[in-house]
Amino acid sequence: MSFIMSSLRNLFLSPLRSFIQKDFHDAFDSMTLLDKLLFMMVHFVDKLILWHRLPVFLGLAYLAARRHLHQEYNLINVGRTPTGVRSNPEDYPYRTADGKYNDPFNEGAGSQFSFFGRNVMPVDQHDKLKKPDPMVVATKLLARKNFMDTGKQFNMIAASWIQFMIHDWIDHLEDTHQIELRAPEEVASECPLKSFKFYKSKKTPTGFYEIKTGYLNRRTSWWDGSAIYGSNTEALKKVRTFEDGKLKLSADGLLEQDENGNIISGDVRNPWAGLLALQALFIQEHNLVCDTLKKEYPKLEDEDLYRHARLVTSAVIAKVHTIDWTVELLKTDTLLAGMRANWYGLLGKKFKDTFGHVGGSSLGGFVGMKKPENHGVPYSLTEEFVSVYRMHQLLPDTLQLRNIDATPGPNKSLPLTNEIPMEDLIGGKGEENLSRIGYTKQMVSMGHQACGALELMNYPIWMRDLIPQDVDGNDRPDHIDLAALEIYRDRERSVARYNEFRRRMLQIPISKWEDLTDDEEAIKMLREVYGDDVEELDLLVGMSAEKKIKGFAISETAFFIFLIMASRRLEADKFFTSNYNEETYTKKGLEWVNTTESLKDVLDRHYPEMTGKWMNSNSAFSVWDSSPEPHNPIPIYFRVPQQ
């Protein structure tokens, strides 16, 4: 009987297989019948380059189908999974210092020094680490020629925010062995550094037969606010006051310093003034939550206040990222609806506020689900996730300081007073200059300045001669060329190059440079570096060159990693699902999260005059003197994207 069914299935699917591009035949053959049908739908839409032009409800259906396929075929575990060991969830109704015990079936999942997972299988590039030379790629294709910005869409607070998230999520453990890159003669005169030394990523045996070695994450992978709390007990002790649950913060609202002059915060490595400002803001948020909870529940002691406030503050950060930052990054009605559905479900905020979480993740959202969902793969962030978050082009060459004493002009615009080179805003210098500038002026200035665009030839030159720091925030002696290093890192960590990356993410690969971009100068330089071999194209270069979807500040290639991993950060975490309740957060704490909708709400709590006086835009992440978006009377699911 099974033979007959198999024959009938093959008879039905054979004609369909001929429609599918050959790149996907092996993947298609490995799929279940339902997944094959979903893939056919996705592939058909991809061939027509259509999904982002569909009415919103159809675009959401496409993204739901694609996300399902990625959840089935693009979540790959690295390392062993423990068997027969289970912790009691009731023993850990709080976020631990190192991220352990979130998953009762795998205590180490997402914790400090757990493995980075994979979205696609590793592609060994040991024999191609310098082909083409990373410094040639950086010089000819990445280095900034003329600054390109994002217009009014995305500002410097938005650029700072993503570094704030990176300091929460990811940092590879390094080896003790240094290696050196030297600039080839053809580009040496254009390279700020003729050579530079750096530490290799530390390879660690996994104890597993399929992927034998992997890389460890020095930060916790959970959305747990570790940028302000740290990723272990030692770091947490440094930031806590041990009074009323609070964290250390100076009287001027900026970060405190230790006896060595280093900042006191959860993660102190490689900061700049924008990151420091956000760390300080959310320490203020944590401390205000503590005050509020203490007033509401006088019997709560220091440890309980800290634990509840951390849960609340981490959830506020996750919510702001989900329904505010990402919505501005992917500025389309489809993604506005999609990101809000991640948090509130398709039934929407009003329904959820009234009736609670109803239905599964689609109708009710990931937040508040009855139990976490990891799709059978232990939670981690992935090597590919790290790669698509390489966004240093967002940073400009200078920060434009505004005169906050002047009377705001049209759209609350402010005159420019002076510009500070970005080199003076990183590390210890950045901390000193932030103190001189003052918090309000720093935030308002960042709010009024557009950030850089994620394009070819827009990587900051000043980042090609950069002083990196160690994990304690101390400057290292060897400067680095970060643009070249990022190319090397992807190859070193066996991340697939652009075309293979797309294939394995079920995206149609390019066959010629013209498929990637219409820019003739870019095509000329791509040929100069890679010849006509599109398979050699590095991932970062391809994502920078790729034609952008209207409204997207990132490439579609990067977005599909976002699609799966943004959902995963919420749905796999018990504190956003089964434990997202009054018992865990307290009634007042849960109310705090549920009534926070944006970064503007957070700013208004701590700097009540700031947004009212100087912000004209809808979001604190778009340029502040931009016009508010007009009301659209058409229900969002029935809107059609403007071409």
UniProtKB/Swiss-Prot annotation:
Pfam families: An_peroxidase. InterPro entries: A_dioxygenase, Haem_peroxidase_animal, Haem_peroxidase_sf, Haem_peroxidase_sf_animal, Oxylipin_biosynth_metab. Coiled coil: none annotated. The active site is at H167 (proton acceptor). GO terms for biological process: defense response; fatty acid biosynthetic process; oxylipin biosynthetic process; response to oxidative stress. Heme b binds at H172, H392, R489, R493. Disulfide bonds: none annotated. Binds 1 heme b (iron(II)-protoporphyrin IX) group per subunit. Binds 1 calcium ion per subunit. Keywords: Calcium, Dioxygenase, Fatty acid biosynthesis, Fatty acid metabolism, Heme, Iron, Lipid biosynthesis, Lipid metabolism, Metal-binding, Oxidoreductase, Oxylipin biosynthesis, Peroxidase, Plant defense. The record marks R269 as: Transition state stabilizer. Its cofactor is heme b; Ca(2+). Alpha-dioxygenase that catalyzes the primary oxygenation step of a variety of 14-20 carbon fatty acids, containing up to three unsaturated bonds, into their corresponding 2R-hydroperoxides. Involved in the production of oxylipins that function in cell signaling, wound healing, and protection from infection. The lipid-derived signaling pathway is involved in the initial response of hot pepper plants to pathogen infection. This is Alpha-dioxygenase 1. It comes from Capsicum annuum (Capsicum pepper).
